[in-house]
């Protein structure tokens, strides 16, 4: 994935804000799917996986002591 190296270089706060943005976009996609107007159904899956990857990097930063709790 092309974003892995980019995510590794991001700070904890940047990762959290990116995750929150993607979660909001994912919710919008879910609502569009319910209404029935979704252009690319695979976009939901890829976004969900990207959120999971961000969660992994956030957790790694927390364990390394870089996260602000």
Curated annotation (Swiss-Prot):
Q: Which keywords does the record carry?
A: Ribonucleoprotein, Ribosomal protein
Question: Taxonomically, which superkingdom?
Answer: Bacteria
Which source organism? Treponema denticola (strain ATCC 35405 / DSM 14222 / CIP 103919 / JCM 8153 / KCTC 15104)
- Give one GO term, molecular function aspect: structural constituent of ribosome
Q: Does the keyword RNA-binding apply?
A: no
Which GO biological process annotations does it have? translation
Q: State the GO CC annotations.
A: ribonucleoprotein complex; ribosome
NCBIfam families, sorted: L29
Which Gene3D superfamilies does this UniProt record tie to the protein?
A: 1.10.287.310
InterPro entries according to UniProt: Ribosomal_uL29 (IPR001854), Ribosomal_uL29_sf (IPR036049)
What's the protein called, per UniProt?
Answer: Large ribosomal subunit protein uL29
Q: Name one Pfam family in it.
A: Ribosomal_L29
Its family?
Belongs to the universal ribosomal protein uL29 family.
